[in-house]
């Protein structure tokens, strides 16, 4: 559906006009305005969003790939809804929308930072505006089908191997009836202590989230027992640490399908740079969010 939507925008003449409208923002971060469509697709799924960067010049596409995952994909919504339902029940509707807005703000801030560090000037590109037209259903389906098949062909093998590795980590016990996933999460959990969620279960859920963002809730539900996910969230997080966790979750590297797609489009070296940058951005942002909330002791977060 995402590929069909992208094809419709391109063939109808709407896409170039959307690019023109977004040019003040994209040029500010040193990226071609043609990257506006991939950014919008990022709210649906990061994989086709990365694929659509082919329409952007190589330099802008690489720079856009650093901040593209900051546009929150739909797979993250269940996690946001679960946390908001537990810690911000009365302010539920006022919490979800700012999360998505903050993702866009983080993308602009870190995009501007990348432009300044790279000493890149603002981009003023020219976009041709074709006439509006209604594309035929068959052409949309044919083009989107070709794009979908190409994506599956490129990432299927790697994704299958990584999924198998995730299964092994979850179900193979190492010692004391602990799975390999639990052992790994126990090793890395101290890293997240300054962020307010330095426990094994939170770390395990973040590892699961790398394989699929919905895996965060799945991982938590496995160990929730009869109490359910809500009980586990209340036990693991305070309001401040919950906001810190969501900040990290919103900014840390996307799922393996997206990472694999990034590798196929830009190469292994660039993919590693993107993952390291996104992890660093998530860690630093989450650290400051947690420390500031604790320092200010806002009544809402006590």
Predicted features by range, described:
Residues 16-46, 120-143, 187:
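Juxtamembrane inter-helical linkers in multi-pass membrane proteins
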Residues 74-97, 257-266, 290-299:
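Transmembrane helix-loop junctions at the membrane interface of multipass transporters and ion channels
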Residues 29, 50-63, 164-279:
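Extended, low-charge hydrophobic alpha-helical regions
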Residues 43-49, 66-81, 98-107, 211-217, ...:
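Membrane-embedded alpha-helical segments of transport systems
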Residues 34-38, 64-65, 92-96, 203, ...:
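Alpha-helical transmembrane segments and their helix-entry boundary regions
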Residues 2-11, 22-29, 39-46, 70-74, ...:
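Hydrophobic transmembrane alpha-helices
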